[in-house]
């Protein structure tokens, strides 16, 4: 069975990691000196936090990386018992081979409960001579200050377009795909700097055809073309509510889009609309209200229709 491409093409070493050049430079320095503090990786999903941690371990330990590296997902195992058992048991044993210390990687550590984080802080202190921790999170504000102060913090930003393009072209070449310019642009649009999402969309599109076109990408990603969203919003802004609502229903039915997905794309189009700054402010406010109501459980079609109606009377 074929591996997911995100795993098949995951970088094995720090030198292979795409983007984040300054971060990779500092991590490589830790490997060369065989010395590092506890680390905190923060950033949105799919930007390379886990990949960087795995590559660091492989560069640091070589063939014994599996024995000296423990990876846990804190969103699945978020209670204090995990810290007291799995983490503590691994942290207090000596490293294998000539490794200076072991590494424990806690993915999505912002999901740890407050009690678990306090227990983790004590474990970090107690075993700091033979163990280092790498914490990965989406929201660093959810990590308690005593842990943050013990870590060197690395902020992973969304990947740049050129980094995404380079990697997508490389994978396409290895998989014998014809990645068209429109297909690349579409993947860049739907992934928003998320390399994992970009590769997953590419693999899904490749299951449909070896010719990766704009149309296929938007279809498999269940996203509308930006011009489809712009057409709908422009109709609404021009007071053509019925036509705008018809376009909305087409997006929801033909493209299988959720109300939340459509709302996010409308929000992304706001800066490009030919309306005044004041009208853009009022529109963003209306989008925020619509988003809140949908999250609270209101009917998506009714709320999005109400948003389109408001667009026609913006002041």
Curated annotation (Swiss-Prot):
Q: Which SMART domains match?
A: AAA
Please give the superkingdom of this protein's source.
Answer: Archaea
Q: Name one GO molecular function term.
A: DNA clamp loader activity
Query: Which is a GO BP term held by this UniProt record?
Result: DNA repair
- List positions binding ATP: 43-50
Q: What are the GO cellular component annotations?
A: DNA replication factor C complex
Q: Which SUPFAM superfamilies match?
A: P-loop containing nucleoside triphosphate hydrolases, post-AAA+ oligomerization domain-like
Q: Which keywords does the record carry?
A: ATP-binding, DNA replication, Nucleotide-binding
Family annotation (CDD domains): AAA (cd00009), HLD_clamp_RFC (cd18140)
Q: Which InterPro entries match?
A: AAA+_ATPase, ATPase_AAA_core, DNA_pol3_clamp-load_cplx_C, DNA_Rep/Repair_Clamp_Loader, P-loop_NTPase, Rep_factor-C_ssu_arc, Rep_factorC_C, RFC_lid
Quaternary context: Heteromultimer composed of small subunits (RfcS) and large subunits (RfcL).
Q: Which family does it belong to?
A: Belongs to the activator 1 small subunits family. RfcS subfamily.
Role description: Part of the RFC clamp loader complex which loads the PCNA sliding clamp onto DNA.
PANTHER family listed in its UniProt record = REPLICATION FACTOR C / DNA POLYMERASE III GAMMA-TAU SUBUNIT (PTHR11669), REPLICATION FACTOR C SUBUNIT 4 (PTHR11669:SF20)
* NCBIfam families linked: PRK00440.1 (NF001679)
What's the protein here called? Replication factor C small subunit
């Amino acid at each position: 069975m074929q591996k997911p491409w995100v795993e098949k093409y995951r970088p094995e070493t720090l030198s292979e990691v795409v983007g984040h050049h300054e971060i990779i430079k500092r991590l490589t320095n830790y490997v060369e000196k065989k010395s590092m503090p506890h680390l905190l990786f923060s950033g949105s999903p799919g930007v390379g936090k886990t990949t960087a941690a795995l590559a660091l371990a492989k560069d640091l330990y070589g063939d014994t990386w599996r024995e000296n590296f423990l990876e846990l997902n804190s969103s699945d195992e978020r209670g204090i018992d995990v810290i007291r058992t799995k983490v503590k048991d691994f942290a207090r044993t000596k490293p294998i081979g000539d490794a200076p210390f072991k590494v424990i990687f806690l993915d999505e550590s912002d999901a740890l409960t407050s009690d678990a984080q306090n227990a983790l802080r004590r474990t970090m202190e107690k075993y700091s001579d033979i163990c280092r921790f790498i914490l990965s999170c989406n929201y660093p504000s959810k990590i308690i200050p005593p842990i943050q102060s013990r870590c060197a913090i690395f902020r992973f930003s969304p990947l740049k377009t050129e980094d995404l393009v380079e990697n997508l072209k490389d994978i396409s070449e290895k998989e014998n795909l014809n990645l068209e310019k429109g297909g690349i642009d579409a993947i860049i649009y739907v992934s928003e700097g998320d390399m994992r999402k970009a590769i997953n969309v590419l693999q899904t599109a490749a299951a449909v055809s070896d010719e990766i076109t704009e149309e296929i990408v938007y279809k498999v990603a269940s996203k509308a073309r930006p011009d489809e969203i712009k057409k709908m919003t422009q109709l609404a802004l021009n007071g053509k509510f019925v036509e705008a609502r018809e376009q909305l229903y087409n997006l929801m039915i033909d493209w299988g889009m959720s109300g939340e997905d459509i709302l996010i794309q409308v929000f992304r189009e706001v800066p490009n609309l030919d309306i005044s700054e004041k009208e853009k402010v009022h529109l963003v406010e209306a989008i925020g209200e619509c988003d809140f109501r949908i999250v609270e459980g209101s009917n998506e079609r009714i709320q999005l229709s109400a948003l389109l109606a408001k667009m026609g009377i913006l002041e």
